[in-house]
């Protein structure tokens, strides 16, 4: 992310080291809904340490005597952290949660619900991070600026793979370039979707970086696709003078392109900016139909509200904040520290 701008570039970062131990990084999943208490699916809220979400699903499915494929999980959490999340299992009996404990895994809560938990049934993730050796005073200045200016909703480096290889493979799939890596991805649905998503994310980051460079991060342009931050609804900006104050109040945000073959470009000046980005890449929207047609395209909010709570530690500080599904804690922490450390993120 070293080529991406900071919204707090005028402020020095706190410095410091992130994630020296799993306990330094905690992620608590905020579900889209809570289990109702009745139904055929057993819902378990689990805490894991040093275990992946797949490890937890496998362990619990075996203990409950159900096939692993029947388990439900809203999002995958990294193993190098302390995380909590809900999992679901089609089990008639109500087991003793204590009996399901395993190394690095414990059940915090059990309930029931009518439906299986599905990927994406997450409202947000709550992050708590320790920054060892960080300057609390500087962190507070950056956090205050973030609260006022908003968080650029960049994708973190985890999205792109080592040295950006996933995005490079995705571009090859879109352009039709024949490479060994693109050939493998074309035959493997998981790799294909991963690579195409990485390339879409790279182009979104470029779009947002250009917008920030032109002083349009918290502005409304004629023709902008706008997203309502409370409901996710989309509309076209027809009156920038009216929509601009709503952007500033975090009611709405420009919604940048995750380019795809079914996406419609924004209108007016905003659409012209998107078209120039595609032209610079030498691609057209229709090119995203290559590789199985799975890159249909969508819109992503450019600017988010984030409130970071800070407290001192003996050797640094602790930061706590909540982000909507799909936003990256890495982006928040690089604004606070001005470092480029990579953090585990929700991999849903």
UniProtKB/Swiss-Prot annotation:
Active-site residues, record numbering mapped to chain: 78 (nucleophile)
Any one GO molecular function term: RNA binding
Main EC class the enzyme belongs to: isomerase
Key words, A-Z: Isomerase, tRNA processing
InterPro entries, A to Z: PsdUridine_synth_cat_dom_sf, PsdUridine_synth_TruD, PsdUridine_synth_TruD_CS, PsdUridine_synth_TruD_insert, TruD_catalytic, TruD_insert_sf, TruD_pseudoU_synthase
GO cellular component assignments: cytosol
Reactions catalysed according to its record: uridine(13) in tRNA = pseudouridine(13) in tRNA
Ranges for domain TRUD: 150-304
Record-stated family: Belongs to the pseudouridine synthase TruD family.
Function: Responsible for synthesis of pseudouridine from uracil-13 in transfer RNAs.
Protein name as catalogued: tRNA pseudouridine synthase D
Gene this protein is translated from: truD
